[in-house]
Amino acid sequence: MSKEKTYLKWYNKVGYGSGDVAGNVVYALLTSFIMIYLTDTIGLNAGVIGVLIAVSKIFDGITDIIFGTLIDKTHTKMGKAKPWMLYGFIGCAITLIGVFAIPMNMDNFAQYAWFFICYTLLNSVFYTANNIAYSALTALVTKNSKERVQMGSYRFIFAFGTSLLIQAVTFQFVEAMGGGANGWRTVAIIYAVIGLIVNTISALSVKELSDEELADSETKTEETKYSFGEAFKILVHNKYYVMITVTYILQQFYGAMIGVGTYYAKYVLADENMFGTFAWFINIPLIIALIFTPTIVQKWNGIYKLNKYSYMVATVGRLLVAVAGYMGNIPLMLAFTALAALGQGPWQGDMNAVIASCSEYSWLTKHKHVDGIMYSCTSLGVKIGGGLGTAIVGLLLDFSGFKGILTVQPDSAINMLHIMYLIVPFALDLIIAFILSKMNVEKANAEIKEKLGISENEVVMESQN
């Protein structure tokens, strides 16, 4: 078997990966701090916030497919995805500031409306366009499977590094900026500007391959012919796309539950800065795992086994976190949190490569190139999983009797925090581990190639674009 052609230098991979600094400026700030900002600073009801977020998610499922289709049909000098990545984040920056700049002199109804409009525009329109385009670049700037894994690893190293910093310093940063509503607004402005700069650098650091390099003329003709309905059918008939989407949704739902750590640290551990400590024990092991993921994938000659066994480790780790949490043993909680994060890391690094293989599966079975819409699962997962998770957090907090104006919360609220922060993440990891044990798309592709009598390199060169 001939060696795969390489397309990227190290600085292209690093530049691309830095784009998740911008994505996590939005995502980490929203999932970790939006609820506690709205309840404890603005004074809004957690249950109402949860309902508004849930309603906002109705728009998300529609816009994900729409933007994925639009990217597939875009043809500009910059390429298919880069224009959406660049211009989409301008809207992200503006609406992110809007979410954290709710006027205190408005009545509650107007504040809820302000939040809903800004939050929906941020998630359903601008973040969708930016994130799907950013993810799709993995398939548009290289056809080399190993480079795709490396791009994913660089990407998520930046993602978790950014998430770590935001989770670790935001509470103190808000206080340094004056605290209260003004402090949150100032921090959001600073984060948005940083994200805008880094997103631009990332988009300009890679070059999309030409149509001629990506596919032959026959494939291009097919690509421009499929309709929205056909694209949807291609996706739902690809069982691996469904698996990846469900996994991504559960994973982001998991992130929303871990975001309850802001409340858990403040009201259970009686020290809100402990949230930052837990962030270190989550993100450092994730980054370590990401660094070694490409090497392990190459050594094991595949992704499936690594994802399967590493998530088993993650599941055991979260079970032990729950046990330590109910024991009240913080050092053990931190240690097992690190173990769980170490197990979750490989999937974060090789996920984009799995999606690329999933796209190849669609080409092998349906003979259609749907890379842009295939990567809609990442944005769909972030918004439905993270957004719906945040919504459920709000509803459960309200149901438990939580009141942001109270210094000491009732026992029912404390018990609910234990369930959301300790039990639910373990259950989610268990489900994800089961799905990953069934997600052997590499084997499925190899069997189809053998049946069709198509060489491995020929398929990689012509279909994974």
What are these regions (language model features)?
Residues S2-Q464:
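Membrane-embedded alpha-helical bundles of multi-pass transporters/translocases
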